[in-house]
């Protein structure tokens, strides 16, 4: 081989040297021999080294697609996939493995490829750091590592790549700051570091890069301002730093970037005005400043940028009028986006019409002015004849939609919603044959939908909701065969849904809620096979659901509530496997709910107030993502299925007002996200489950009107977020646990109509957000806790009636200044009515009747009717007899006295007759006895008669109300025999009514 030959030649030369020439001459010639003889060997060594380096780089990669399987020492390295060599010389100059699905890391050994000028490892899944060793590759001109999963910081060693022209390392989760050393890469033309996680400021050393043409730093977390030194990048064509946290003002020096074609500063925190120097960027075609905090007006200097095609200044705080910018001067402008600023005034006539003669001479295709405070009409837009998209929504525009709207024949999108347009939808709208989106919602449009709308064969979205439109939905609308979404919510459309609705084969959303539509749901609706959302609620639709409903295989949301639909559900609905939301509440549906349970993806099933019967099928639990299950007000019966415990995402469970029986299933304890549990109005038995206390998200618990027994479990105190607790109308007993006081968020506590005993726990004072407290019709005893006066939000009612409460009314109740109704009737309260109750200025219903109260009624409380105080024998003062007046005897006492008078009178007559017959025979003795009896009796009768007369007179003159005693007795008797609490209102006179008017008693 070559090495052996070389060795032989050297030996031969040395042998000859001993005989012919001196050794010094031989040694001097030896390198020349080596260079000649060993050249092939040196080249082979270089190739071998490059091959070994590449194989070492390969070892760091994972190659699932086997792209690098051909890399082997036996093959020529220049034939390896992705390797580029200098033609004819075998020197590796490029490595391109972009998009090969590689993972793994970049080996530092890659720096051994000293002759490589281009490395492209982009669009793979490489991880790890960028090797700092890359900075030693002096020949490198192109480094593309973008779109990988590289992490760590950008190595500052890259600043040593003096020949580097193209650096793209974006779309990696790189962290840290941009190394200022990159400013030493004097040949750099492109820097791409977008979509990383870089922080810190843009280094001012970037301004040293005189050859830089593109700088892309979008979507990082860079801070600080734009460095003034960027003005040194005289060749910069693209500057994009969008979606960072850059702030400060836009430097006026940016106007010195004379080569700039694209400027994107969007979604930062720049403030101040738009520098007029931007008008010096004569080559600018793209200007995007959206999403900053810019103020001031739109500089007129922008009109000098004749090459501009896109201007987006939206989502700032720009003010003034838009007349500063003229599409007629910016003849290449296609996009003008000024949405969501503070612009005012009107749409200028000269926007697209420079000569003012109504002849448009601009190229403007897309105009977005939404979310400002523009007024006036949109007539000026009619000269922008190139327009394809108009969005002037969310302004204060007025007037009518101009009939000449068809002067914009290329219009594709027309968005006029959220303004104050009036008048009718002009029939000329049907001439816009390219129209795809018509959004007119939330205006004041009247009249009907013109039949000409049926010409819009390309129309996809038709939004007319929240207007005042009337008339029938025209059949011609169903000729718009491209329609995908129709929303007429909140108008006054009447008549039937068009029978030809099935022509809309592409319809995905049909929203007709809150109109006056009548008649049945058309059977042809089943032909709308693309329908995903159907909302027909709040109309006057009637009839049964058509069997064709079962063909709507894509249907996900269907709301039919508040109509007059009836009958059993079609069995075909069981085939609707994509249903997620069903709301059929407030109709007249009957039969079983099984047809609605074909889908296992239900999140809402609301069937409240219908006439569904049977049991809840266990199949309902297949929809494990169910959030709301509302079956209240039906005729469902049987036990609550234990399978409901599988609905672990459930937040609302309302089974109230049905015929369910049995215990509350313990499996419901698995529904840990429940916020509302309503089981009231059934026939449930057993105890209130202690596990309810584990439902930490519970906000409403209503188990009222059942047949539950036992006590209130102390565990309920664990429901710290509970807002409403209602256990009324059961057979519960025992004491009210003090743990109820832990429910500090409670607004409503209703425990009435049970058999609770013991005292009212003073711990209730901790429920300081209570605005309704009902404990009536129990057997509670002891005093009313003064602590109840510490419930400052109590407003709707405090009802403690029909218990066995004793003691005095605590003065602290006067602190309940928001209270509107107070019922303490039918207890054993004694003492005086505390004057502090006069502080209850919001009180309009009061019932203190049937207690043992005494003393005078405090001043302003006299405005309440006498029934509010009845049954308290020692109370006096208006509206009762005044204090100190003779007491009016009850009817029983009057009857007894009358009977006594009659008996005594008869006895006197008999005695007198007896005396006369005796002819004075025993006069002295009889006279003595008769005289004493007679005087006593006569004086008693006279006293009784005077007392009743005086009492009657004073009683019926109290106030200005005169009520017969029998009526009064009947009223009180009625009040005391009622089975529900009765509160008595103030007379109308106190509220401004006529004298003597009395409000009827009200039930709570």
Provide a role label for each language-model segment.
Residues 1-1004:
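Plant-biased, solvent-exposed loop and capping regions
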């Amino acid at each position: 081989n070559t090495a052996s030959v070389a060795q032989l030649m050297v030996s031969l030369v040395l042998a000859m040297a001993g005989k012919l020439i001196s050794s010094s001459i031989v040694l001097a010639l030896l390198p020349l021999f080596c260079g000649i003889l060993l050249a092939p060997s040196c080249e082979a060594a270089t190739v071998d080294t490059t091959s070994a380096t590449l194989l070492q780089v390969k070892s760091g990669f994972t190659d699932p697609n086997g792209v690098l399987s051909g890399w082997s020492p036996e093959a020529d390295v220049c034939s390896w996939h992705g390797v580029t060599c200098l033609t004819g010389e075998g020197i590796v100059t490029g490595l391109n493995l972009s998009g090969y699905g590689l993972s793994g890391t970049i080996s530092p050994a890659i720096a051994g490829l000293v002759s490589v000028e281009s490395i492209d490892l982009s669009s793979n899944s490489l991880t790890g750091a960028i090797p700092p060793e890359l900075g030693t590759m002096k020949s490198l001109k192109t480094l593309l590592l973008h779109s990988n999963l590289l992490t760590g910081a950008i190595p500052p060693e890259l600043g040593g790549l003096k020949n580097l022209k193209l650096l793209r390392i974006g779309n990696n989760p790189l962290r840290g700051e941009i190394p200022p050393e990159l400013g030493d890469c004097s040949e750099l033309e492109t820097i791409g570091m977008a979509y990383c996680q870089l922080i810190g400021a843009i280094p001012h050393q970037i301004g040293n890069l005189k050859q830089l043409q593109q700088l892309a730093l979008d979507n990082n977390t860079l801070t600080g301002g734009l460095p003034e030194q960027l003005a040194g990048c005289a060749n910069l064509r693209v500057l994009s730093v969008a979606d960072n946290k850059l702030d400060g003002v836009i430097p006026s020096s940016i106007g010195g970037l004379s080569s700039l074609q694209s400027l994107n500063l969007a979604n930062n925190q720049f403030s101040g005005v738009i520098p007029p120097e931007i008008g010096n960027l004569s080559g600018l075609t793209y200007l995007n400043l959206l999403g900053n905090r810019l103020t001031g007006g739109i500089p007129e200097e922008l009109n000098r940028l004749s090459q501009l095609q896109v201007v987006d200044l939206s989502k700032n705080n720009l003010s003034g009028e838009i007349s500063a910018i003229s599409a007629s001067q910016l003849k290449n402008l296609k996009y003008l986006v000024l949405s969501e600023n503070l612009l005012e005034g009107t749409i200028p006539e000269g926007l697209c019409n420079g000569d003012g003669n109504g002849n448009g001479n601009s190229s403007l295709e897309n105009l977005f002015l939404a979310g400002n405070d523009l007024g006036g009409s949109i007539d000026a837009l009619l000269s922008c004849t190139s327009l394809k998209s108009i969005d002037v929504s969310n302004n204060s525009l007025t007037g009518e939609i101009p009939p000449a709207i068809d002067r914009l024949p290329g219009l594709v999108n027309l968005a006029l919603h959220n303004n104050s347009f009036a008048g009718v939808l002009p029939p000329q709208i049907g001439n816009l044959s390219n129209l795809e989106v018509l959004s007119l919602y939330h205006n004041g449009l009247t009249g009907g939908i013109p039949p000409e709308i049926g010409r819009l064969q390309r129309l996809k979205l038709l939004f007319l909701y929240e207007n005042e439109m009337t008339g029938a939905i025209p059949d011609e609308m169903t000729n718009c065969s491209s329609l995908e979404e129709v929303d007429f919510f909140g108008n006054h459309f009447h008549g039937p849904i068009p029978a030809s609705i099935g022509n809309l084969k592409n319809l995905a959303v049909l929203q007709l809620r809150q109109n006056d539509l009548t008649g049945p749901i058309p059977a042809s609706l089943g032909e709308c096979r693309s329908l995903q959302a159907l909302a027909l609620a709040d109309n006057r639709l009637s009839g049964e659901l058509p069997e064709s409903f079962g063909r709507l295989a894509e249907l996900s949301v269907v709301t039919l509530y508040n109509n007059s639909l009836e009958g059993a559900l079609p069995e075909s609905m069981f085939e609707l496997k994509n249903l997620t939301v069903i709301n059929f509440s407030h109709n007249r549906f009957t039969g079983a709910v099984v047809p609605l349970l074909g889908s296992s993806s239900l999140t809402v099933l609301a069937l409240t107030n219908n006439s569904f019967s049977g049991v809840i099928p266990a199949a309902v639990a297949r929809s494990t993502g169910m959030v709301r299950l509302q079956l209240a007000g039906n005729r469902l019966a049987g036990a609550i299925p234990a399978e409901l415990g599988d609905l672990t995402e459930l937040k609302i469970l309302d089974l109230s007002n049905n015929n369910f029986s049995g215990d509350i299933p313990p499996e419901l304890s698995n529904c840990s996200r429940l916020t509302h549990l309503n089981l009231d109005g059934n026939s449930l038995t057993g105890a209130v489950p202690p596990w309810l206390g584990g439902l930490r998200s519970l906000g409403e618990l209503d188990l009222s009107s059942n047949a539950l027994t036992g006590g209130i479990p102390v565990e309920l105190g664990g429901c710290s977020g509970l807002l409403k607790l209602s256990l009324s109308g059961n057979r519960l007993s025992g004491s009210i646990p003090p743990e109820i006081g832990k429910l500090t968020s409670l607004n409503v506590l209703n425990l009435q109509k049970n058999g609770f005993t013991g005292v009212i726990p003073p711990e209730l004072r901790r429920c300081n957000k209570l605005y309704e407290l009902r404990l009536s019709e129990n057997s509670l005893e002891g005093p009313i806790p003064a602590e109840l006066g510490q419930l400052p939000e109590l407003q709707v009612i405090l009802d403690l009636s029909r218990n066995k409460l004793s003691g005095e009314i605590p003065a602290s109740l006067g602190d309940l200044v928001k209270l509107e109704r107070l019922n303490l009737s039918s207890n054993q309260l004694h003492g005086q009515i505390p004057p502090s109750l006069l502080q209850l200025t919001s009180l309009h219903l009061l019932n203190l009747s049937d207690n043992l109260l005494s003393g005078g009624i405090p001043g302003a409380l006299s405005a309440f009717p006498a029934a509010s105080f009845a049954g308290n024998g020692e109370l006096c003062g208006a509206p009762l007899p005044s204090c100190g007046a003779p007491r009016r005897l009850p009817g029983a006492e009057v009857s007894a006295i009358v009977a006594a008078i009659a008996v005594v009178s008869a006895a006197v007559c008999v005695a007198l007759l007896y005396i006369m017959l005796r002819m004075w025979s025993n006069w002295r003795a009889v006279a003595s006895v008769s005289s004493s009896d007679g005087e006593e009796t006569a004086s008693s009768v006279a006293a009784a008669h005077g007392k009743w007369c005086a009492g009657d007179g004073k009683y019926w003159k109290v106030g200005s109300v005169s009520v017969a005693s029998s009526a009064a007795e009947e009223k009180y008797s009625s009040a005391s025999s009622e089975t529900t609490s009765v509160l008595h209102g103030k007379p109308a006179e106190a509220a401004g009514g006529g004298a003597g008017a009395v409000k009827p008693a009200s039930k709570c």
